[in-house]
């Protein structure tokens, strides 16, 4: 699921780079912990609220592109937040506990936000959780 969001961001940024006129805003949403079962549950719940059997589609399930991916880190079957965030932001897997470096822990990798900023875009990052 994490690569899905990276794919969507990559496609959006690519389209923005080659489209005329240039996109004014690009949003990259990350549904942490959200998989197919969570989406299906939400759609089933929304349909039930309307007294229907079946699903009521969420808007993002209607996007023209989607992908299914593996979400393990470079060294573990279960990804932690550091490795997951690095993969989402940079497109590179790393070791659990590592942030913005490859699994060798020496080679830095840069986020799509940094690339956008270098390209002249204004960048903002928001979260719904505290940074501990």
Predicted regions mapped to residue ranges:
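Sec/Tat signal peptide C-region and signal peptidase I cleavage site
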Residues: 15-19
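N-terminal catalytic scaffold of extracellular/periplasmic and nuclease hydrolases
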Residues: 20-132
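Sec-dependent N-terminal signal peptides
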Residues: 4-13
């Amino acid at each position: 699921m994490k690569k899905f969001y990276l794919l969507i961001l990559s496609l959006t940024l690519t389209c923005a780079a080659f489209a005329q006129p240039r996109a004014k805003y690009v949003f990259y949403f990350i549904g942490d912990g959200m998989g197919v079962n969570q989406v299906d549950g939400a759609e089933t719940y929304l349909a039930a609220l309307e007294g229907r059997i079946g699903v009521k589609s969420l808007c993002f399930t209607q996007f023209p592109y989607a992908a299914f991916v593996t979400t393990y880190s470079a060294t573990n079957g279960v990804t932690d937040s550091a490795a997951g965030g690095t993969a989402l932001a940079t497109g590179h897997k790393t070791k659990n506990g590592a942030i913005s470096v490859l699994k060798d822990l020496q080679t830095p990798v840069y986020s799509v936000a940094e690339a956008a900023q270098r390209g002249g875009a204004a960048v903002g990052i928001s979260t719904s959780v505290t940074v501990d």
